[in-house]
């Protein structure tokens, strides 16, 4: 089996696990099991803070790792404890104080894994894929994961209606265990391609972030994109808090999220290589700015879902375009460090947004909060466009 097939398969299996153990599904699960909206926000934001710490600690050695493939594969093993804990909660019927403590610990491990992967995610493709077609490859991968995500979200809705919420989640968490193991095996058995960069040296180039122009000139862009992403990451909590979502409509959010991932990936697969990345980023970030406020106009569930669908379609394109732009901005020899620094800014903004989201809504209202979210993405798009145009990047 080729690396490309393994890449597609592992990504598709991982989206199943990630859908059921993070984001909207995890937020709904916690709130359905007695956690308040604010505590749910704190738990999710704490995970982001842990990811930041993991990236901060791992960043100095990211470009010195010789065995990128096996190290990346092992990070997936850190996801098992959270899946097992969520399954136990389903079987017992409640958290209790012991399981609540364990929840924080397992989310911590989950977040450490995410932080480590963030440092390696832009080095792995160089080892296993033909980077000349990286944009198209990731877009096709996004289409596959989007289709899978849409299917499993429909299955989630059907199971909840047929079996009840608790039984449905028990079955799905149980399914996550073999899928997670298969993901690990697929990545672990990948082999470096002939054109893969040579193994890193112990004296690999070390960058000074505050003298490295790509990092410095895009600080605001990456931080504000993270802040906007942080609001969207807790969108179910926002919907619950603003009284426009319940468990049933939250399940629809998951369906929309996966459908728009498919739509955004399909759109990106068509335009990548034909339209310069700087223009893709600018146009889609303008789309984000326009669509995010729609979610909380009039406190309507229908408008919330329409706005969310539009926003996440543009968001998907942005999330695929920035990694491709990053391959133009930074050289492979410093890719791990630059990516760690960039994602550190992004995750810092995301974590801060998670902590402040409910407070912002209380302070300025739901609609102004979503307008602010859109403006964050607009600044990101303009900043990347100006930087890439100035440096003659495509």
List where the protein language model places each region.
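Intracellular juxtamembrane helix-capping segments at the cytosolic ends
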Residues: 114-129, 317-330
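Juxtamembrane intracellular "pre-TM" segments in multi-pass secondary transporters
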Residues: 1, 193-220
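Helix-to-loop junctions at the C-terminal end of transmembrane segments
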Residues: 54-67, 160, 264-277, 361-362
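Helix-loop boundary and gating motifs at the non-cytosolic
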Residues: 1-53, 213-255
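C-terminal transmembrane helical hairpin of 12-TM major facilitator-type secondary transporters
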Residues: 279-319
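A membrane-interface helix-boundary motif in multi-pass transporters
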Residues: 68, 158-177, 359-377
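Structural signature of the two symmetry-related core transmembrane helices
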Residues: 70-86, 279-294, 374
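Loop-to-transmembrane helix entry/capping segments in MFS-fold secondary transporters
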Residues: 37-38, 129-141, 247, 330-342
